[in-house]
Amino acid sequence: AYPTIRYAYNGMLHRGAYLPGDLFSAVDGMGEERSVLWCEMTDPHGNSCTIESQQGEVVFDVEGIYTVRVCATDEANRRSVCEFQIPVNR
């Protein structure tokens, strides 16, 4: 089975910087934890960026709904990409 990616929060996030591993988790078909490889984020104004998991934080700097696509792979290199709509407030 392909990895399952989960978003760790319910409700709104506050503006600020988060590590991808604090926001998202992934498990493979055997229930083993997998790393999130990258996130593609589009802010409420339509600006996009990609964040490599080992390289930086996901920054939510304006209020609104962000679209975040998250990628994870398992040991067999099967890839899952999930999209989340994340509301951000002050």
Features from the language model and the residues they span:
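Solvent-exposed, low-complexity, repeat-rich "mucin-like" stalks and linkers
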Residues: 1-35, 41
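A structural signal for beta-strand boundary/capping segments at domain termini and interdomain linkers
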Residues: 33, 48, 79-81
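Short, solvent-exposed loop/linker segments at beta-strand-coil boundaries, enriched for Pro/Gly
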Residues: 39-49
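Aromatic sugar-binding surface patches on proteins
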Residues: 50-54
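Short strand-edge motifs at loop-to-beta-strand transitions and within beta-strands
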Residues: 56-58
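Residue-level recognition of secondary-structure-to-loop junctions
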Residues: 60-62
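Append "Rare intracellular matches occur via the same short Y/T/C beta-strand/loop motifs
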Residues: 64-75
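C-terminal edge beta-strand
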Residues: 80-89
